[in-house]
Amino acid sequence: MLYNIININILNSNILLDIISILSIISSIAIILVSNPMYSILYLIILFINIAIYLYLIGISIMSLLYILVYIGAIAVLFLFILSLFTALPYLLESKNLKITELNNTFLHKNNNIPLFILIIIIFYYNMINYFNNIYLNNNNINNNNINNLDNINNILLNNDWYKIFDINHLNQIGFLLYTEYSILLIFISFLLLFSILSAIVLTHNK
């Protein structure tokens, strides 16, 4: 019974990871093919969200949090702010409204993007073949060699002190390294973000 429940959970988790991976690939392709920079940045944010969810599901929660804070919270929002001032506002004033058909016309109607799109499809197809081959080999190895080990999984779950495994806090370790060994880099990155915000304000004021 426990073996069947674990298999169902693993299968559902793998399906969810596959869906997130496919959405990430679609978002990355849309970033390249969309000509409007505003839509490109929006697809970039969607890509970062998918990557953060993927990292959280595989157990790397700290990297997922960093993706949301750094990429989505700082870089993507800053790009959206700048692009909205210098590109989206004149575009809105000229066209009066955003036409949804223009978003559809940007896909596969740009001749210069078709070779790049074909190259991405070939790379994606090659990686998917290797991915499914590895899954098939891993499933065969599990079915042939590890059935006896899975019979004792109930004893493993009940007899181990799991709180000792999670006793180490990754967030505390990263914070300690950032403020001690890599403090100069942290200050340098802070100044870069400060200068980027100030430059955006100055350019907006001059405009």
From Swiss-Prot:
It is a multi-pass membrane protein. One of its GO terms (cellular component) is mitochondrial membrane. Its EC number is 7.1.1.2. It comes from the Eukaryota. It is found in: Mitochondrion membrane. Keywords: Electron transport, Membrane, Mitochondrion, NAD, Respiratory chain, Translocase, Transmembrane, Transmembrane helix, Transport, Ubiquinone. It catalyses: a ubiquinone + NADH + 5 H(+)(in) = a ubiquinol + NAD(+) + 4 H(+)(out). It holds the Pfam family Oxidored_q3. It is an enzyme of class 7 (translocase). The chain crosses the membrane at residues 15-35, 40-60, 66-86, 116-136, 184-204. One of its GO terms (molecular function) is NADH dehydrogenase (ubiquinone) activity. Core subunit of the mitochondrial membrane respiratory chain NADH dehydrogenase (Complex I) that is believed to belong to the minimal assembly required for catalysis. Complex I functions in the transfer of electrons from NADH to the respiratory chain. The immediate electron acceptor for the enzyme is believed to be ubiquinone. PANTHER family: NADH-UBIQUINONE OXIDOREDUCTASE CHAIN 6. Belongs to the complex I subunit 6 family. This is NADH-ubiquinone oxidoreductase chain 6. It comes from Wickerhamomyces canadensis (Yeast). The gene is ND6.
